[in-house]
Structure formats: C-alpha cells, structure tokens
C-alpha cells in the first residue's frame, strides 16, 4: 500500500512537470502581445508590422502540427520532449540576441515548430503518465498550467520587459525551460510511442463522423471566441470607456477564469461529456451577445468576461478530451489535426473581427462572434443526432 502511494506521488509529480511545461509554452506564445511596443521601438518599426510575428507564429503551428507529428510519430516520447526543449531553449537564446527583426522571426519560427509538436503529444502523454483513476484530473492540471500562463506568465513577462527590456523576458523564459528540461530528464521514464498513428490513420479518422463534426465545431467555436477576444482591449477602451489599466485587468480575469474552468472540468465533464460541451458553448454565445449591452457597466463587464473566460476554457478542455476519446488508436495524429484546426480558428476569428471593425464597427464584434457560436451549436446538435446511432466502433463516443 505504501509503495503504491509512493508510485502515485511520483506519477502525479510527473504530471505537475508537464503542467509547468504547458505554462512555459503558453507564456512564450502570448508574451509578445505584452512586448510588441518595446520590440517595435528596439527595431525602429511600427507596432502593426511587428505584430505580424504573432500571426506568423499561429500559422506555422497550424501548418506544421500534423506533418511534424507524423515525422516524429515513432520516436520515444521522453527523448522527443528533451529534443523539443533543447530547440525551444536555443530559439529563446537566439531571440534574446536577435540583431534584427528577421532574426527574431526565425527564432520565433523555431519556437512555433516546438509548439506544434508539443501540443500534439502532450495531452495523450500526460494521461499516460498520470496515476490510475486520475486521468481527467491530470488533463485539468495540464490546463491549469496553461491558464497560469495568462495569470502569471503574461503580466510577469510584461513587468520584466518594461524594467529590463524584452530580451530579458525571453532569456528568463529560456532559463525556466532549462529547469523544466532538467526535471524531464530526471523524472520521466522512457515512454514508447503508443497509438500515435501514421498517414494510414488519416483515412480511418476521416471515416469517423463525430470526429469530423468535432473538428468543424472547433473551427466555428474558436473563430467565434477570437472574433471578439482578439480585439477585447480596444473594445474595452473605446466602447466600454475604461482605463488602459482596467482593460489590461480584463486579460488577467480571463486567466483566472481558466483556473476555475479546469476545476469544473475535472469534476463535471466525466458525468455528462456532451452536456458539458454544449453548455459551455451556449454560455460562451450568451456572453458574446451581452458583451456590448454591459460594456458601459464596470462591474457587469468584469463579471461577464469572467463567465466568458470560464466557458471558453472549459470548452477547450472538453473538445480536447473528446478528440482523445474519439481517436484512442491514433491520439497523436488526431490531436495534431486538432491543434492545427484550433490555430486556424484563432487566425480566422482575428480576421473576421478585423473585417467587422472595418465594415460594421468595433461595437459589433460580440454579436458576430455570437452568430458563429449559435451556428456551432446547431451544427453539433444536428450531427450528433444524425450519427449518435452509428456503431460505437465508428463513432467512438
């Protein structure tokens, strides 16, 4: 009994290491948002041009997730993680010493490549190393690490960047990643590739209607969210008439809400997965509908943003878990496709929001996002009703 408890502790600590890894990956993905002005000043560029770094990052992840995962499908997972972190650290060193913007883009491309593989394998890997009967909780802890990147990583990165320069922020991210690498080397056992899938998996996955339904649902939902979220700061300042500091606080509220969402997911998802998923997107859609209506009411807008953040974070977790459940025999391929599709949603939502601002006005980003949210609900319900009676080995529900 004592030995079993010790094993459980070691396994759970391994999950914590993966949560730290998720934290550092999400921090480096979003921290440029807080450093754009400083980066632009150092290279004597307009902020709008510097911002292309974020777009390029997202599209590299989107394009490379599946090909990179397939190329690494047979590699032992511990060795693969070590290799990813070495490239991740080297890319941050290059970022810190980048002598021009083009070199910084190359460095960020290296980080994006590691991102595309890391998120393709991490969810399934975390579940494999978790203690028995703690699989859902392990995924929730992984999500907690991601959420803390918004709560702690983003503001700390901004504070450090303002005090010591943006290069110091990237340097410290690299140092933190090096500490995680040491823990991976010391704590993770050899983890053979398992159910990773291959090119042969693609036709098999394509014949799973609920998986395809979920992928399309993901594009719609994430586009709905990022149609509004991409421009939440100017919306708060120009439409909500709040100060710049309060607008920044909104981003922190989103991070805190992710922590709450991970707790709710751990406790509620396994009870009724489909209801949990649909309830989350329904709440998200309602929040987007109400965004403009409460924008001028300080307390109400903060409460709404918190609810919105809980909904999208819970929804992201539910979709990721559902992908794993629908493709247990090709988890890495299915997750790689999901990661790429998720980033398509990010880019698509930002583009839609941009067009809404130009043609309908900033005030309407919530309404357009809500339309996409409503379409996603209708799509999922219709497809679920259509395919819910398909044999289990095809639908894999």
Swiss-Prot record:
Instruction: Provide the Gene Ontology terms for cellular component.
Output: plasma membrane
State the InterPro entries in the record.
MFS, MFS_dom, MFS_Efflux_Transporters, MFS_trans_sf, Sugar_effux_transptr_put
Compartmental location: Cell inner membrane
Q: Name one GO molecular function term.
A: carbohydrate transmembrane transporter activity
UniProt KW Secreted keyword: no
Alphabetical UniProt keywords: Cell inner membrane, Cell membrane, Membrane, Sugar transport, Transmembrane, Transmembrane helix, Transport
Where are the membrane-spanning stretches? Answer: 15-35, 51-71, 80-100, 103-123, 137-157, 169-189, 209-229, 246-266, 277-297, 299-319, 333-353, 365-385
Keyword Cell membrane in annotation: yes
Tell me the function of this protein. Involved in the efflux of sugars. The physiological role may be the reduction of the intracellular concentration of toxic sugars or sugar metabolites.
Q: Known NCBIfam families for this protein?
A: PRK03545.1
Q: What is this protein called?
A: Probable sugar efflux transporter
Q: Give the source species.
A: Mannheimia succiniciproducens (strain KCTC 0769BP / MBEL55E)
């Amino acid at each position: 009994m004592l030995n079993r408890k010790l094993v459980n502790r070691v396994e759970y600590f391994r999950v914590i290491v993966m949560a730290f890894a998720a934290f550092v990956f999400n921090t480096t993905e979003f921290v440029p948002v807080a450093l754009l002005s400083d980066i632009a000043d150092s290279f004597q560029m307009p902020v709008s041009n510097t911002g292309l770094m974020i777009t390029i990052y997202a599209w590299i992840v989107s394009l490379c997730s599946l090909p990179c995962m397939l190329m690494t499908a047979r590699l032992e997972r511990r060795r693969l993680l070590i290799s990813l972190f070495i490239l991740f650290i080297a890319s941050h060193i290059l970022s810190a010493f980048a002598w021009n913007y083009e070199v910084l883009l190359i460095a960020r491309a290296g980080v994006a490549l590691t991102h595309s593989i890391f998120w393709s394998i991490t969810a399934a890997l975390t579940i494999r190393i978790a203690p028995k009967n703690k699989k859902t909780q392990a995924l929730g802890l992984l999500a907690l690490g991601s959420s803390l990147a918004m709560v702690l990583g983003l503001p700390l990165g901004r504070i450090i960047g303002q005090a010591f320069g943006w290069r110091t922020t990237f340097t410290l991210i690299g140092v933190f990643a090096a500490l995680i690498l040491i823990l991976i080397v010391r704590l993770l056992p050899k983890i053979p590739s398992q159910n990773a899938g291959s090119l042969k998996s693609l036709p098999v996955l394509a014949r799973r209607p609920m998986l395809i339904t979920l992928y399309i649902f993901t594009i719609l939902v994430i586009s709905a969210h990022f149609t509004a979220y991409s421009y939440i700061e100017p919306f708060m300042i120009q439409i909500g008439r709040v100060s710049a500091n309060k607008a920044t606080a909104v981003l922190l509220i989103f991070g805190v809400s992710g922590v709450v969402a991970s707790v709710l997911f751990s406790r509620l998802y396994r009870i009724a997965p489909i209801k949990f998923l649909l309830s989350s997107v329904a709440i998200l859609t309602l929040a987007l509908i109400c965004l403009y209506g409460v924008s001028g009411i300080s307390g109400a807008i903060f409460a709404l943003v918190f609810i919105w953040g809980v909904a999208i974070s819970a929804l992201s977790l539910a979709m990721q878990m559902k992908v794993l459940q629908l493709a247990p025999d090709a988890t890495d391929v299915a997750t790689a496709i999901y990661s790429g599709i998720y980033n398509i949603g990010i880019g698509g939502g930002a583009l839609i929001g941009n067009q809404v601002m130009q043609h309908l006005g900033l005030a309407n980003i919530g309404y357009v996002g809500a339309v996409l949210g409503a379409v996603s609900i209708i799509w999922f319900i219709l497809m679920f009703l259509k395919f819910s009676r398909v044999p289990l080995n095809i639908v894999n529900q």
